Amino acid sequence: MVSETPGAGSPAAPVIPLVGIGTDIHAFEEGRKLWCAGLKWEGEGPGLAGHSDADVVAHAACNALFSAAGLGDLGQHFGTGRPEWSGAAGITLLTEAARIVRAGGFEIGNVAVQVVGSRPKIGKRREEAQKVLSEAVGAPVSLSAATSDGLGFTGRGEGIAGLATALVYRTA
C-alpha cells in the first residue's frame, strides 16, 4: 500500500505493516475463576494461576501488540514487579497495551488469537469474546481454538495456552 501526500508530486513512502507474535501459558488452579478472552466462564472448571486474572487470550494479544511495535512484553509493562497490576483483568491490560502501542506512534490493524486447550469451549461464545476483545483493542480481533489431541500439558488438562499475532502500522 502506498499513501499519497496531498499536493506532492511523488508518492509518500510505503506504509510497511509490522507483525508481532505473542504467547501466554497458565496452569489451572482450584479456587480461581476462569477468565479467558475477556469473559468469565462459569461451569468450565477451575481458573488459571497468575499475577492477574491469567486470561491467556488477552495476555497473548498484549504480547503480540508489544512485539509488533517493538515495545517490550507483558512482563515489562504489567509483570510481578508492578504490584498495581496484581489481580488486574486481562481485558484491562489489553486496553492499556493498545493505548501504549498507539502512544508509541503506531496504529493497530488487527489481532488474531488462538487458544490451545480442551476448555473453555470457545466456539459457543466466540462472537461475544471477539466483540469484547475488539472493543478493548480498538481494532478487529479474531479468536480461534484448537486442542492438542491429548498431548502435552494442554492435552493432560493441566492448563491452556494462547498464541497471537498482531499487525501494526507506524503513524509517527
Curated annotation (Swiss-Prot):
Keywords linked to the UniProt accession: Isoprene biosynthesis, Lyase, Metal-binding
Pfam annotation, one family: YgbB
Top EC class, one word: lyase
GO biological process per UniProt: isopentenyl diphosphate biosynthetic process, methylerythritol 4-phosphate pathway; terpenoid biosynthetic process
Source superkingdom: Bacteria
Binding-site positions, a divalent metal cation: D24, H26, H59
InterPro entries documented for this protein: MECDP_synthase (IPR003526), MECDP_synthase_CS (IPR020555), MECDP_synthase_sf (IPR036571)
Transmembrane spans: none
EC number(s) reported in the record: 4.6.1.12
Function, in words: Involved in the biosynthesis of isopentenyl diphosphate (IPP) and dimethylallyl diphosphate (DMAPP), two major building blocks of isoprenoid compounds. Catalyzes the conversion of 4-diphosphocytidyl-2-C-methyl-D-erythritol 2-phosphate (CDP-ME2P) to 2-C-methyl-D-erythritol 2,4-cyclodiphosphate (ME-CPP) with a corresponding release of cytidine 5-monophosphate (CMP).
Family: Belongs to the IspF family.
Subunit and interaction comment: Homotrimer.
Protein name in UniProt: 2-C-methyl-D-erythritol 2,4-cyclodiphosphate synthase
Source species: Streptomyces griseus subsp. griseus (strain JCM 4626 / CBS 651.72 / NBRC 13350 / KCC S-0626 / ISP 5235)
Species lineage: Bacteria, Bacillati, Actinomycetota, Actinomycetes, Kitasatosporales
